From Swiss-Prot:
Keywords: ATP-binding, Cytoplasm, Glycolysis, Kinase, Nucleotide-binding, Transferase
Binding site for ATP: 8-13
Transmembrane segments: none
Catalytic activity: D-glucose + ATP = D-glucose 6-phosphate + ADP + H(+)
Zinc as UniProt keyword: no
Superkingdom, natural source: Bacteria
PANTHER family cross-referenced by the UniProt entry: GLUCOKINASE
Family: Belongs to the bacterial glucokinase family.
Stretches assigned to coiled coil: none
Protein name: Glucokinase
EC numbers, comma separated: 2.7.1.2
One Gene Ontology CC term in the entry: cytosol
Annotated organism of origin: Chromohalobacter salexigens (strain ATCC BAA-138 / DSM 3043 / CIP 106854 / NCIMB 13768 / 1H11)
Keyword Isomerase: no
């Protein structure tokens, strides 16, 4: 009997694990482990396998929210680091793939059900064209995806670390706030959970008011309750999200559509359709007609990254 393969999607905050029949997408024994509770990746894997009572898998594909091109992988938003070679030897994996988390998000998109996609505005996907997968969580992920002759071909990027480009005087004032705190300001500094909180604090400072909220969830809750500063921060967050995702769609030529993933946006579905996201996405000067026709969806599938790791396991385009 074929042993199940180990599948993982590891972010800065949580590690999600599952088992799957190699070559299939029948996820089972899905668990979410807080990264901070485990000193290392190996400890988390062992804890997961013990919890679900599974035999040691011989195949594994794990996705991480950080660069993964070297043998030594260092997480960007938590303290884990490991050697791919040593982990494969430690667990006896005969097949061990390590991919970027947004490579996994990209590869998961073709396997998402239609009722797990929420359209933002109009647009029609061009067949056979590149897709953009983009979204904020603990950090900001960005990847491309296009159909190859036999398999889906992912284009991993670290596009979340491109420089933030303000589009009006208010954003130039916000940039000055972020520069005072961080020096160089990447778009990830703004388009992530901590970035939403920082945007709120920046709005408070610019308005010469006291910031009352201390977590992104508190800011979102206050915005829903009508707090003007929190509301302005959230609306600006979504407008900048449109700016950056529209720029990324131009860079990749993503006429196949834009898929917004991550832990934040599915919780903002009541805000996104009424925000300036879509206008900012399309507002690209001479390229307005190009971006205006690109469809955008929010992916609500809870385990999209795990589905992508399943796809990657035996996808010959993913090494």
């Amino acid at each position: 009997m074929t042993r199940p393969a180990l599948i993982g999607d590891i972010g800065g905050t949580n590690a999600r694990f599952a088992l799957v029949t190699p070559g299939a997408f029948d996820l089972h024994d899905i668990r979410t482990l807080p990264c901070a509770h485990y000193p290392s990746l190996s400890d988390a894997i062992r804890a997961y396998l013990k919890e679900v009572g599974a035999e040691m898998p011989t195949e594994a594909c794990l996705a991480f929210a950080c660069p993964v091109h070297d043998d030594e992988v260092r997480m960007t938003n938590n303290a884990w680091r490991f050697s791919k070679r040593q982990v494969a030897e430690e667990f006896g994996f005969t097949l061990f793939k390590v991919i970027n988390d947004f490579t996994a998000q990209a590869l998961g998109v073709p396997h998402v059900a239609d009722d797990e996609l929420v359209a933002l505005g109009d647009g029609e996907a061009a067949p056979g064209c590149t897709r953009l997968i983009f979204g904020p969580g603990t950090g900001l992920g960005m990847a491309g995806l296009f159909p190859g002759q036999h398999d889906w071909i992912p284009l991993p990027t670290e596009g979340g670390h491109i420089s933030f480009a303000p589009t009006d005087q208010h954003e130039r004032d916000l940039l000055a706030y972020f520069q005072a705190r961080y020096g160089r300001v990447s778009v990830e500094r703004i388009l992530c959970g901590q970035g939403l909180l920082d945007l709120y604090r920046a709005h408070a400072q610019l308005a010469k008011q006291v910031a009352r909220y201390n977590t992104p969830a508190e800011v979102t809750g206050a915005a829903r309750a009508g707090d003007p500063l929190a509301r302005n921060a959230l609306e600006r967050f979504l407008k900048i999200l449109g700016d950056v995702s529209g720029d990324a769609a131009l860079m990749l030529g993503a006429r196949g559509g834009v898929y917004l993933c991550g832990g934040i946006l599915p919780r903002l579905l009541d805000w996104l359709p009424h925000s300036h996201f879509r206008d900012a996405f399309a507002d690209k000067g001479r390229m307005h007609a190009y971006t205006a026709h690109i469809p955008v969806w929010v992916v609500t599938a809870p385990w999209n990254g795990l589905l992508g790791a399943c796809e990657a396991l035996h996808n010959e385009e993913v090494t």
